[in-house]
Amino acid sequence: MTQENQNPPPEQEDVAADPQVNEAAASEPAAVKTPEQEIADLNQQIGELQDNFLRAKAEGENIRRRAVEDIAKAHKFAIESFAEHLVPVTDSLYAALSTDAGDAKAFKEGLEITLKQLLSAFEKGRMTEINPAVGDKFDPHHHQAIASVPSEQDPNTVVSVLQRGYTVADRVLRPALVTVSAPK
């Protein structure tokens, strides 16, 4: 035998000595999947994705439903807070009606106290009066002109207030009814 036959070429030695190459070669047949296996794997992935989709869809619907319920509760109980502030006013009015006092001055004082209670309840409910002063410029967003009368004041200014208006949280509930000065 010659020396060439006894010693393998250096390329063959490297391949035989490298265990990673041997493992890769051994695992290659296992990595190759049959079409049936690939179809089964893809069907499993489809099932998982459909399940995830349905769960996400159900979660979104639950969030939407809870949001609708929360809004309904907020509307329902928002008025409850305002109503709680009105109860003492009602109590005061019933107390005033039940007295037989003939004293007009005492009755007027009781009404003034009740009005203060009512205005306090309005304030707590973020409800404010629109009560323009005579001479204020007419504001169509907060005032409603009922009549226009000749006046010494500038045109389109408030001459008198017939009925106060109200806002709730900066939104006009009812405009103030006013008489304005006519253009000259």
From Swiss-Prot:
SUPFAM superfamilies: Coiled-coil domain of nucleotide exchange factor GrpE (SSF58014), Head domain of nucleotide exchange factor GrpE (SSF51064). Disulfide bonds: none annotated. One of its GO terms (biological process) is protein folding. Keywords: Chaperone, Cytoplasm, Stress response. GO terms for cellular component: cytosol. The keyword Chloroplast does not apply. Participates actively in the response to hyperosmotic and heat shock by preventing the aggregation of stress-denatured proteins, in association with DnaK and GrpE. It is the nucleotide exchange factor for DnaK and may function as a thermosensor. Unfolded proteins bind initially to DnaJ; upon interaction with the DnaJ-bound protein, DnaK hydrolyzes its bound ATP, resulting in the formation of a stable complex. GrpE releases ADP from DnaK; ATP binding to DnaK triggers the release of the substrate protein, thus completing the reaction cycle. This is Protein GrpE.
